[in-house]
Amino acid sequence: MALAPPGDAEAGTSHFSIVDARGDIVAMTTTIESAFGSRIMVRGFLLNNQLTDFDFAPGAANSVAAGKRPRSSMSPTLVFQGEQVQMALGSPGGSMIINYVAKALVGVLDWGLDVQAAIELPNFGSRNGPTLIEQASRYEALSAALVERGHQVDRIPLTSGLHGIERVPGGWRGGADPRREGAVRGE
């Protein structure tokens, strides 16, 4: 393992999936929202600015109200078969996280892909607006057909940052999205 090359640092959300030698496993997504969060530090920890996730239009489902928490798309996921964990998965990516995680789950559970192949599938989805398709992916070819059917389609970079681990005979196999920082490491 080596240091990351210099470049623009990602701000906001991080995710990791880890399994230890005993089989204890975690999928953890954490965020302080934007770089340095609220810019307020308490006892050495930066506080997040999660309140910016509220809809400030009165009466909306996610509008500000006393005792309410803002909607979050964080989706650290553990998949079980009976009592045994089969997979840990998650991603940064704001409101697109649910789309990213669902894509990888369908790839592994429904299509029989390994976790790396499922993570590498092109990204797509919606945030209650236009259909979003990953720019420069094989799904761009679908854009014209969707537009003909009345969809508004935007082709944009969608760099998920998915990280996952799946149980395989004799151990574990990891996957990390090559579109963003992250790596698989094991012994």
Regions found by a protein language model. Give the residues of each.
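Amphipathic, membrane-active segments
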Residues: M1-A2
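Proteins synthesized as precursors that undergo proteolytic processing into mature forms
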Residues: P6-I156
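Cofactor-centric catalytic regions
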Residues: E10-A11, R138-E187
